[in-house]
């Protein structure tokens, strides 16, 4: 039995030998299509000026990824300018973005991301509720308060996938 992976679909083919010939014939072909992603790969950018928080979030995301059979690559950035520069060359599937940062705040960073034509989902992380309404203007996927509740984070990640 052979299988072919096409995008995220697995197609399994099997055939039997023909009884009256000496070579394989497709007398019986069974095609099964399974919606199953064999390797789930995710690239996530984390933009936060607090290094300890970035490490904590990275650890939580790594734990979530292992639990859900994802291969995870994390790209940490300490400010919005560095993130914007990187997004020109590094494709990401999801961005975690702090709001209160030096140089360029998270809302303005998200505005720039959208002006670049990128539709990548953004999850804001901040210690303040005051920017929640502004996050809708830049089409945020979610808004989480610091310190991050692990169960809430995992729930948001589950909703994303």
Language-model segments: which ranges?
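Conserved sequence signature across two-component system core domains
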Residues: 47-48, 77, 95
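Two-component/phosphorelay signaling modules centered on CheY-like receiver
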Residues: 50-75, 115
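Acidic di-acidic motifs
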Residues: 48-50, 127
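CheY-like receiver
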Residues: 84-161
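Extreme N-terminal starter segment of soluble prokaryotic enzymes
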Residues: 41-44
């Amino acid at each position: 039995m052979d299988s072919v992976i096409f995008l995220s679909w697995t197609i399994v083919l099997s055939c039997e030998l023909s009884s009256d010939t000496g070579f394989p014939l497709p007398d019986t072909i069974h095609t099964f299509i399974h919606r199953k992603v064999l390797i789930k790969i995710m690239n996530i950018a984390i933009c936060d000026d607090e290094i300890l928080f970035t490490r904590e979030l990275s650890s939580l995301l790594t734990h979530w990824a292992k639990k859900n059979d994802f291969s995870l690559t994390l790209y940490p950035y300490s400010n919005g300018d560095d993130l914007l520069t990187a997004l020109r060359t590094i494709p990401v599937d999801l961005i975690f973005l702090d709001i209160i940062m030096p140089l360029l705040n998270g809302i303005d960073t998200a505005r720039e991301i959208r002006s670049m034509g990128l539709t990548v989902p953004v999850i804001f992380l901040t210690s303040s509720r005051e920017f929640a309404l502004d996050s809708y203007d830049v089409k945020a996927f979610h808004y989480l308060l610091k310190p991050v509740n692990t169960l809430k984070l995992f729930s948001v990640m589950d909703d994303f996938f």
